[in-house]
């Protein structure tokens, strides 16, 4: 894709910058992808998930173990997600062929025997942090032991709430759009009405981390989690692979420190559509009831939802761009994209510059000064408007 623009009448010799954008990759990222919360799949029924260019079925066996198979029956193409769980197998609604969690056909009630080649694709799963993950690898390799989803300390104890969880289906955009946010400090000010004060990135191996300290903007009440200008929010957000981020947050307000853990994750539906999921748990404060703590987690998740809706509005209307024109304060976009590329190439084609440790801290001096001036000007205009005579 190339967007041409007319040459300006300027006297300088600078050439017009053209936007370059190749087609979105047709393969899906290698790595762990979260499909949702365990509790949403543990009702004894089959569940349909559109992902990785096909349809999957999630079902629990008699021991409660969740299994994920390709949803289309290898017999005549029936949709297993519309079938019935029978014992440890999922039965196709078309002809009652039954498939266990390993993808093997276990029974055909009307047939004398099961064809020995009757096997479908079973996806490698992981149950952790109250969530279900599947491993995707176009080469068919199993997940390496050192590439996994970490256990979240404290989850499942009485000290923390349970997940408040939400999802959005994003059409017309590739997953890379959301991953770019890892390095995009300025968009937090203009899109999410946060005021970043400190911003740093560290990439290494299969992880990419964003460190940010921010406050709210005095001139904007957005309904997000950044509204209080007197509360500092400290965030350490790490992608573990291409699609699953854990964000550890601390917020100081009214003499108390509130600890929140935010999950930001997604899985691809196609190469230009994905499902974005996010959830929050909050550490319970002394003297705060479980109901109030759960309400805090829900409020935080709702604020995150509004923030992502702001992002989606941008994604729906922006052009994809492979050669972004950057300033010094824009962050290491190209380095992040090199890191991200490792998940879209064969393992043997991963290069050192995709995985070696990289650190970059943005000098926020100029940005903070400019934003403080903008906020002050906006507050002055608001004051003039409130005192104006009708």
UniProtKB/Swiss-Prot annotation:
EC number assigned by the record: 1.14.15.30
SUPFAM superfamilies from the UniProt entry: Bet v1-like, ISP domain
Keyword annotations: 2Fe-2S, Cholesterol metabolism, Iron, Iron-sulfur, Lipid degradation, Lipid metabolism, Metal-binding, Oxidoreductase, Steroid metabolism, Sterol metabolism
GO molecular function, one term: 2 iron, 2 sulfur cluster binding
Family matches, as InterPro entries: Cholesterol_7-desaturase, KshA-like_C, Rieske_2Fe-2S, Rieske_2Fe-2S_sf
Cofactor details (free text): Binds 1 [2Fe-2S] cluster per subunit. Binds 1 Fe cation.
Reaction(s) this enzyme catalyzes, per UniProt: androsta-1,4-diene-3,17-dione + 2 reduced [2Fe-2S]-[ferredoxin] + O2 + 2 H(+) = 9alpha-hydroxyandrosta-1,4-diene-3,17-dione + 2 oxidized [2Fe-2S]-[ferredoxin] + H2O
Binding residue positions for [2Fe-2S] cluster: 73, 75, 92, 95
Positions of Fe cation binding: 181, 187, 192, 311
CDD domains: Rieske_RO_Alpha_KSH (cd03531)
GO BP terms in the entry: cholesterol catabolic process
Residue span, Rieske domain: 32-134
Induction of expression: By cholesterol, progesterone, AD and cholic acid.
Protein's pathway: Steroid metabolism; cholesterol degradation
Cofactor needs: [2Fe-2S] cluster; Fe cation
A Pfam family of this chain: KshA_C
Root EC class: oxidoreductase
Assembly and interaction partners: Homotrimer. The two-component system 3-ketosteroid-9-alpha-monooxygenase is composed of an oxygenase component KshA and a reductase component KshB.
Function text: Probably involved in the degradation of cholesterol.
Protein name: 3-ketosteroid-9-alpha-monooxygenase, oxygenase component
Origin organism lineage: Bacteria, Bacillati, Actinomycetota, Actinomycetes, Mycobacteriales
Gene name per UniProt: kshA
């Amino acid at each position: 894709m190339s967007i041409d623009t007319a040459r300006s009448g300027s006297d300088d010799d600078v050439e017009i910058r053209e936007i370059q954008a190749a087609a979105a990759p047709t393969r899906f990222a290698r790595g762990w992808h979260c499909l949702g919360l365990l509790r949403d799949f543990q009702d004894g029924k089959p569940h349909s998930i559109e992902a990785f260019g096909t349809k999957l079925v999630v079902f629990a066996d008699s021991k409660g173990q969740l299994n994920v198979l390709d949803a289309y029956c290898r017999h005549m193409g029936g949709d297993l997600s519309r079938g019935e769980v029978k014992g440890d197998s999922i039965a196709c609604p078309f002809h009652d062929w039954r498939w266990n969690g390993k993808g093997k056909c276990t029974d055909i009630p009307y047939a004398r025997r099961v064809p020995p080649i009757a096997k479908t694709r079973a996806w490698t799963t992981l149950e952790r942090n109250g969530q279900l993950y599947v491993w995707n690898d176009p080469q068919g390799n199993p997940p390496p032991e050192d590439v996994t989803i970490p256990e979240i300390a404290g989850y499942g104890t009485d000290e923390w709430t349970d997940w408040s969880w939400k999802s959005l289906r994003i059409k017309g955009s590739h997953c890379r759009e959301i991953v770019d946010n890892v390095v995009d400090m300025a968009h937090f000010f203009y899109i999410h009405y946060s005021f970043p004060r400190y911003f740093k990135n560290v990439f290494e191996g299969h992880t990419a981390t964003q460190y940010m300290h921010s406050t709210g903007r005095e001139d904007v009440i957005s309904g997000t989690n950044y509204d209080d200008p007197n509360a500092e929010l400290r965030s350490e957000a790490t992608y573990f692979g291409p699609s699953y981020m854990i964000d550890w947050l601390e917020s100081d307000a009214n003499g108390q420190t509130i600890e929140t853990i935010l999950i930001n994750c997604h899985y691809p539906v196609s190469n230009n559509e994905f499902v974005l999921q996010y959830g929050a748990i909050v550490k319970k404060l002394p003297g705060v009831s479980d109901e109030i703590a759960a309400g805090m987690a829900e409020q935080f998740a709702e604020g995150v939802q509004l923030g992502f809706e702001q992002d989606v509005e941008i994604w729906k209307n922006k052009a994809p761009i492979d050669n972004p024109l950057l300033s010094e304060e824009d962050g290491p976009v190209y380095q992040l994209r090199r890191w991200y590329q490792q998940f879209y190439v064969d393992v043997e084609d991963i290069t050192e510059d995709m995985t070696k440790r990289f650190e970059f801290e943005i000098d926020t001096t100029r940005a903070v000064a400019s934003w403080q001036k903008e906020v002050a000007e906006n507050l002055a205009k608001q004051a003039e408007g409130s005192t104006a005579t009708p």
